[in-house]
Amino acid sequence: MKLLKEGIYQLDRNQISHINESDFKNLVESSSKVDRLRSRVLYHTSPNSEPQHMLMCFDSKSIVEVSFHTFGESFLILSGVAQYRFYSTKDGSVINDVRMSPASMKGIFYTYISPNVAHRFFALTKHVVANEVGYSAFSPEKTFYGEGNLYDASNKVKSEELAIQPLIRNTD
């Protein structure tokens, strides 16, 4: 595994059979040391690869703003507990929550996020490790952030606040 920059690693695609325990430990430890408090191992070979596949680790204080992409993405929780919150693009209101945990905990362990759906990820335990697949290359032209009056309050919510709130379920 090659260090590209602090918190971002690249696997050698010619040698993938497993991730060593020490590599996994490095991923978790580095998530608490980088500015945005998340680290990743890139499985894809270049920034333009499609799809883009990453093993990610989020610290509970990780900074993840409301965002939406022009492509779909999948998220599979391997360890820890997390929550996705989905927002209306019309008025910024919360439309649905999905609390996630590993399959071994018999929780919801997989979420697919459709294109152009406003969402935010929250790590609810000290560390959350997950596989993420973006069905396109991540780029500024394909990713938008919820800013302004619609999402200001949503971007200020902290994981520890969200963890004690009831889940919101859309019944439509």
Would you name each region that the model predicts?
Residues 88-119:
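Short acidic-glycine-tyrosine-enriched beta hairpin
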Residues 64-67, 84-86, 111-113, 119-124, ...:
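Short beta-strand His + acidic residue motifs that chelate non-heme Fe in jelly-roll/DSBH
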Residues 91-98, 120-172:
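Double-stranded beta-helix
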